[in-house]
């Protein structure tokens, strides 16, 4: 049994898969979770290729199935005796202009991106408090720091996660438990490719935003391949063990540039630049 135990959500692809392999390579025991075990093939292949199979346990967990989280944490503790790191990675991006999104679509976005992270965090906090140590890495986004057209549901869920993480950090840091935010920019993770993650009204040619929705999709496709997602996995492994972790870690050239523009430019100038760059003018 390894001394360091990590629980990671959303491990069938993207940051979850890559961080599972990276942490296991560095000696961690990893409980890698996903909501559909039939999609574990890519993770199993990556783990096998890296030669870290003995350090990875793949388990069923739906981040949006909140009533199951306490029992899941209890089982992990029964099996391993401790939880040193929780990576709340599971999430998705609900696309669509605010005018087209329904309240149910907003709720659907929040169930995983926000309430899922809160529920799992609550499930592991008692063990971390008892240990007087632990890290909770919440995978946020640059979208949690500045609004993005056609992404208001995603923005809102990540802004909520940022505020929650700040408050939790102030509450838990004095006892040795450190919530940490990682804020990626545009990385290739597959998060944008699911049709169910787009507002139903976005497919309606009669939507007042039909043309602009098409322009936004084109923009997203052009910016997806900017950076290697392994950089985020390496950052997760770094903050898992660095002695004094920061509150926030923006990552990606575009994330840092957007943050700088948002902080330095007057709102009207920033607004004009974003609308023009994304081709969202009427």
Residue ranges and their predicted role:
Residues 12-14:
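Conserved glycine-rich cofactor-binding loop
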Residues 60-71, 103:
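The beta1-alpha1 cofactor-binding region of Rossmann-like NAD(H)/NADP(H)-dependent oxidoreductases
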Residues 97-98, 105-107:
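Substrate-binding pocket helix/loop in short-chain dehydrogenase/reductase
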Residues 99, 146-152:
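Active-site loop immediately N-terminal to the catalytic Tyr-X3-Lys motif
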Residues 121, 157:
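Active-site helix of classical SDR
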Residues 141:
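Residue(s) in the substrate-gating loop at a strand-loop-helix junction
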Residues 173-223:
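C-terminal beta-strand-loop-alpha-helix "lid" module of Rossmann-like NAD(P)-dependent dehydrogenases
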């Amino acid at each position: 049994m390894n001394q360091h135990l990590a629980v990671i959500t959303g491990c069938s692809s993207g940051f979850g898969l890559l961080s599972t392999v990276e942490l296991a390579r560095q000696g961690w025991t990893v409980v890698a979770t996903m909501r559909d075990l039939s999609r574990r093939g890519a993770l199993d292949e990556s783990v096998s290729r890296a030669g870290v199979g003995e350090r990875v346990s793949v388990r069923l967990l739906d981040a949006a199935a909140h009533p199951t989280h306490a029992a899941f944490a209890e089982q992990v503790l029964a099996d391993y005796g401790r939880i040193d790191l929780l990576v709340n990675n599971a999430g998705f991006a609900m696309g669509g202009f605010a005018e087209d999104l329904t309240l149910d679509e907003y709720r659907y976005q929040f169930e995983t991106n926000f309430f899922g992270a809160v529920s799992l965090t609550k499930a592991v906090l008692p063990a971390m408090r008892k240990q007087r140590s632990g890290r909770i890495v919440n995978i946020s986004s640059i979208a949690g720091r500045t609004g993005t057209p056609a992404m208001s549901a995603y923005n809102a869920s990540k802004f909520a996660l940022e505020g929650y993480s700040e408050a939790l950090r102030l509450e838990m840091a004095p006892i040795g438990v450190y919530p940490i935010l990682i804020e990626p920019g545009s990385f290739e993770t597959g998060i944008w490719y699911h049709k169910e993650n787009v507002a139903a009204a976005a497919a309606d040619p009669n939507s007042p935003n039909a043309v602009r929705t098409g322009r936004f999709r084109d923009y997203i496709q052009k910016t997806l391949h900017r950076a290697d997602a392994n950089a985020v996995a390496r950052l997760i492994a770094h903050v898992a063990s660095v002695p004094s972790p920061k509150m926030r870690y923006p990552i990606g050239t575009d994330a840092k540039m957007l943050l700088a523009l948002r902080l330095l430019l007057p709102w009207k100038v920033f607004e004009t630049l974003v609308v023009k760059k994304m081709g969202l003018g009427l």
